[in-house]
Structures are given as structure tokens and as C-alpha cells.
Amino acid sequence: MKRISSFDTGLYAGRVIAFLFLCCPLRADAISPNEWRFRQTLEVGQGGLVRFSLPAETLDAARPNLEDVRVIDSAGREVPYIIDRPLPQPESAVRPKEFHAQIEGTMTRLNLVTGTKAALRAISLEAPGGGEFTKPVRVEGSQDGQSWRPLAEHEPVFRMPGGASNLRISIPDGAWAFLRLTIDDSRSAPVPFTGAELNTGALSAPTEPMAVSIKSRDENPGVTRLSLNLGAMNLTPASVHLDTPEPLFARTVTVAVPQIGEGDITEKILTSTVIYRMDVGGKTESRLDIAIDRPVEARELVLLIANGDSPPLTTTGIRAERRAVYVMFSSAQAGRYALLMGNSQCAAPNYDLSALAQDLKGAQSNAAQPAGIERNPDYKAADALATVSLTGATIDVAPWGFRKSVKMTGPGTQAVELDLDILARATHDLGDLRLVCDGRQIPFLLEKTSISRPIPMAQSVANDPKKPNISRWSLTLPKAGLPICRIVCTPGPGVFQREFHLSETVTDGVREDFPIALGTTTWRQTPHQKPRDIVLELNPGPTTDRLILETDNGDNPPIELNNFRAYYPVTRAIFRASPVSGAPTWLYYGDGDASVPRYDVSLVATELLRSERLVASTGPEEVLKATIVGDTLTGASLYLFWGVLGLVVVGLLLVVARFVPKAA
């Protein structure tokens, strides 16, 4: 193969640029800058190929795929350009030609014949079963099987309670004919490693620091939810680094982003990894970076940290890096250029430069730095949210039973969390919710989050004397019909293993009672285990406000359970408020015959998702129409109602009987 000299490379780059000038001259096509909302000036010091990185604020103002970005010169003429998104080349895995494992005293020795000349960057071990372990590993490489070079020392491999595991050992990039792994078994029994994969080296890609902050933190049972503000939209986070003072830990972290579903907003999982800090052979090893490398259109990134039975992980800070995005164009001369972005209607440009893209990426170029982003004072086109009517059809609210006022701090996109009153009175699919202002509906989207809120539950012992081996607890919710997803309680001291059953008693149309199973779980508490809360997932959720939890103690003493609380998922209504309307906004609910609304707002759901939100709140509940008392009662209240009603009927019959003339 002919070697290309640096002179040849420069000459070829010059030919590429010359070709650009000849075949892709500055366009004289008419362009109307007033159709773009934002612009940035760009000072070019000399003619030639210009290459610069797009700031986060530019990516934030543009469309996700940058179809609306334009480059214009000082005369307002459009300049062809190329977008370059360097991304890391993904790893590939190969099986070693030979794999041999043997135990030598207090160590396990793994000998691998790689069978490849590719550069290796990691070894992933295979260990069947679910046993827990933590092992330090030493890795050595050799080309002849005789002379060995150390590649890694005290690298941890582990499998922890709760599912956190790491069987990957990173090594410096390099090609090796032989690999030798020595695993220290002096502190625990050997682990049967049965195979391995060799991860070949991947090409790296440039990154830039990104401004990121923790917007909110929510503690769910066994899971910490961190909502991160990325500071801009349309970014590709490369990695997120968590700062924590915890000396020893291992956690599985799941990364998710909000996404548009069927008329609502849910959370989509992007990736999952393990972060840790542990003592391995007297040396502290840690991995606190969470690799992502996925485009994120919204400003928000969600981290779900699985704590298992451990306390929540303390976080003192967070850092992140994003993948760089470059623009390249050919400048005829030095001068001032401008970037335009923020046009939701324009089509993507077609400059016919795709064939030259790879050549231009390696060509010598001049650097430039865009100035700060500015609003275009001549911008005329309306944005997507402004083109959508803030009001829907008129509505007759007579069928609705309840309403609450919605209190807002200003105009713009709003997020109001549905409280217990609304969740209990609304239909199970929330299809009867209506936002109303001045007699007309306000279109909205429902956001279903991974946040869950606790509700304290009243508890009492409800043992049946006829079943002395069964422990029963009566649990009372503040309202019937709440969308409860789990019940959590704290057991007393002691050693036990029990199967718990949760149920409720419902009444059908003819007032006959029958039990409904809501969930079951088996829980174990051993002498060497830290006490942990009992968690019972519900499927389905309850319809009444009274639940029964029971367990069979067998021949063992009964156990103590305290601190019962229920959890429900957080749901928000996302809508846009008018900047001029002074009429109050109401949230109506409680109409079992209402169908799910269909709004044109779904056409701009992405814009609602990506825009900054203000937090709205609800006022006190207002009852709009009378209800049949018996239909609103459940559990003991229902029995008391019908008992009292029966006594009243009997009393009335006795009174009437006294006034009936006796037969002669």
C-alpha cells in the first residue's frame, strides 16, 4: 500500500477546498432571515475551510437534527456546510481461541489464548449462578507465553446483593497473543469462571464539558430518582459522573429520558450500568462514570439509583460531558458570517456535499468561535406552541361531580401534579379530567413519572380468634380508589420467614361481599442481615379504603409490623396557559361516563415536553352535585350505612303499623 505523506495530505485537502469553491459556490438563492428566530455572528479570520464546534445554546435553539441551521455570509447569501458528529466506534466482542481455568492454592488462574491480532481493551468474564462474591484480579499479557507484562492490578470483579455486578476488567489498549488472569481467593471461596469475551478497542470521539445540575431528588422504596437539568436540548451526553463521599458501595444506575407516548409522557430507558467504590486487596477501586452516548431531545435526564436494602447513596455533585458537534464550510474570504437557527417549518438543506464529508473531516481547517446567541428582531413566523390554540371546544360541566382551581405563577407551559382528591375521584384511566377556562377546555398531556409518593396508613390488629396461627392487620387508606402501587412496613426484631397476603373486600351490585387478592410476597429476616422494610407490590390496585394483610405464623411466635405506608405514582397534567386571560382555570373530575379527551396538542407534544415548565398547584375541592351516599362509601362505612338504613326502615314500619286500624 502506498504511504501518504503529510505533503500529499495537505495537497489533497487543498484540492478538496478548491473543488468546493468550483462546484459548490456561495449560493445566491433567496433566503429570508426573518423566518429564523435566532442568529449568531461568526468572525472568520481568513479564507479557506472553517470548522467550529456548535455551543450548547445553539443546539438548544435548533431543531433536534439541525435541519434548520443555515450559514450566511455578510451579503446574506446562503453558504453550503457539513455537519460532523464524531461518535465513538462501538466495541466488538470475540471469544478467545482457548480458555483454561485452574485453582492453585489460594488463587484461581485463567489462561487465555486470544486468537486475534486486534487491539484489546477489556476482558469480560462469565460466572454462572447467582452467588455473591468480590475478587481482586491481576491481568498480564504476553506475545510468546513466556515473558509476561502486567496490564492491570487489583481490578475488582463482583456480584453483590440486589443484582449489582461487574465482571469486566479494563486493560490498556493493545494486541496480545496470551492473557493470564490471577484471581485472589484468600478471603472467600473460589468462583467457577467458565468463559470470557475479549472486547476489542473502540475509537474514541471528542467531548466537551456540559453544564448539568440536579433539579430534583425523590426517594422511592429501594430507589433514588435524580432528575438532571442538562441546561439545553438536543445534546448527546457522553457520560455522567457522580460525586459521593460514600467509602464503600455498589449501585446499579438506570438512565431514562421523558418520551411522548399515546397522548401522554412516559419515561424511556436508555441504558443501565454499575457504579462502585470498594476495597479490593487493601486498595480502593472506584468507577463513578455512567456512559450514555445517546441523543437526548429534552432538557431532562433521569437517573434511577437502585439502593436495594442499603440507605440512599449520598451525592455531593455531578459532572457531565457531551459529544461535540462541528460545522464545516468553505469561506471565500475573511469576514463576518452568521448562523441562523430556530425555524420549525423549513426543510433540511441539500447541498450535495455528502460525497466529500469524509474527506473534509480530515482536511486542515481554520478555527472559529460563534458569538453569543441573539434573538432575530425581524422574526415573524410563530412558534409551534403559539400556533396551537390555547383553548379547545366548549364544555358543559354539569355531569362532573368535582372541581379544583388551578393556581399559576405566570403564563407559559405549566405542570400541575394530581393530588389524592383527584386521583381518588377520577376514573382509573384519568379519562374524565378536564382543564377549563372561561367555559372552554384547555388541551393538556398527562406525564406519568417514575416518582412515587408515600401515604401513611392507619393500622390495627384484626386477628381472628378461630385462626390463632394467622396474624392479620387492618390497614386504612385516607380515601378509597387511590392508585396504590405498593405497601411498605417495618418489621420488628427477630428471625423469620413469612409469606404475606394482601386483600380487600368489595361489594357487588347486590351488596354481597367477596375478597380480592391484591398482592403477595415472601420475606426473610436472618441473624446476619440488617433489618429491612417489607415491600409488597400491588396488582391490581385497591378500590376500597380498607385492606387486610395476613400471614401464617405456623408454630412460630407472631411478628410485629409497624409504620405502614402506601405509595402511589406521581402523574402531572402539562398544558400551556394564556398570557392574557384573567379568567380562573379549573380542573374538573368525577364523571364516570366521560371518555378520554382528544386534543390537537398531541401535534406539538414534543414542544411541550422540551419547553421550560412552571409549577402550578390546585386549590380545595369543590363538590358540584349531590351523590348517592351509599355509592360513595366503602368497607366498614358501607356496612354501617346499610345497617343504620335498615334500622330506620324497621322503625318507620313500626310507627306506620301503630296508625293502621286494627281489624274488628
Residues covered by each model-derived region:
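N-terminal secretory signal peptides that target proteins for export/translocation
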Residues: 1-12
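General helical structural elements
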Residues: 6-7, 19, 662
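Bacterial N-terminal signal peptides
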Residues: 14-25
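Extended non-catalytic domains of envelope/secretory-pathway proteins
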Residues: 31-664
